[in-house]
C-alpha cells in the first residue's frame, strides 16, 4: 500500500488543532512543502521550518490559535481531503468550486504545480482538487 502524503498532512494538522497543540511535525516531501507554502501565504499557519533528523527531513509547523482564554476552544480552520488515491476528483477551469463564497481556499494540483483556486482561475487552468480549507 502506498502512502497518501496529502491525507497525512491534513490529518496531522487537524488533530493538532483539535488537541490545542501549537506545533506539528510532518514528513517533508515536495507536495507537502508546496501545500505548507500555500498555508503560510494564506495565513492559516504562523511559521514553518525544515528540520533534519537521522537523514530524514521534517517540516515543523507552528499553528495559529486564538489567544483568548475564556470560552470554548474554537478550531481556527477546517481541512477536508477531496481527491484521494481510490477516487480522483478533477475540475476544469470553468468548474473550479468556491468555498464559503470565496472565504475558503481550494488547493489544486495542476500541470503548473500546486496552487490555490484563485491562482488557477487567473491562469485559466484546472486540475486535481487536493483539499478544501476554510
UniProtKB/Swiss-Prot annotation:
SUPFAM superfamilies: Ribosomal protein S8. GO terms for cellular component: chloroplast; ribonucleoprotein complex; ribosome. Pfam families: Ribosomal_S8 (PF00410). Part of the 30S ribosomal subunit. One of the primary rRNA binding proteins, it binds directly to 16S rRNA central domain where it helps coordinate assembly of the platform of the 30S subunit. InterPro entries: Ribosomal_uS8, Ribosomal_uS8_sf. The lineage of its organism: Eukaryota, Viridiplantae, Streptophyta, Embryophyta, Tracheophyta. PANTHER family: 40S RIBOSOMAL PROTEIN S15A (PTHR11758). GO terms for biological process: translation. Keywords: Chloroplast, Plastid, Ribonucleoprotein, Ribosomal protein, RNA-binding, rRNA-binding. Belongs to the universal ribosomal protein uS8 family. It comes from Coffea arabica (Arabian coffee). It is found in: Plastid, Chloroplast. This is Small ribosomal subunit protein uS8c. The keyword ATP-binding does not apply. One of its GO terms (molecular function) is rRNA binding.
Amino acid at each position: 500500500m502506498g502512502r497518501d502524503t496529502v491525507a497525512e498532512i491534513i490529518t496531522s494538522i487537524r488533530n493538532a488543532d483539535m488537541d490545542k497543540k501549537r506545533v506539528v511535525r510532518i514528513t517533508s516531501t515536495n507536495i507537502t512543502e508546496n501545500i505548507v507554502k500555500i498555508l503560510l501565504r494564506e495565513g492559516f499557519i504562523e511559521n514553518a521550518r525544515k528540520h533534519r533528523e537521522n537523514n530524514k527531513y521534517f517540516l515543523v509547523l507552528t499553528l495559529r490559535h486564538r489567544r483568548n482564554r475564556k470560552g470554548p476552544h474554537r478550531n481556527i480552520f477546517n481541512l477536508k481531503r477531496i481527491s484521494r488515491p481510490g477516487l480522483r476528483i478533477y475540475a476544469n477551469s470553468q468548474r473550479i468550486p468556491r468555498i464559503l463564497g470565496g472565504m475558503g481556499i481550494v488547493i489544486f494540483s495542476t500541470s503548473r504545480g500546486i496552487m490555490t483556486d484563485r491562482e488557477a482561475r487567473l491562469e485559466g487552468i484546472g486540475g486535481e482538487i487536493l483539499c478544501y480549507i476554510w
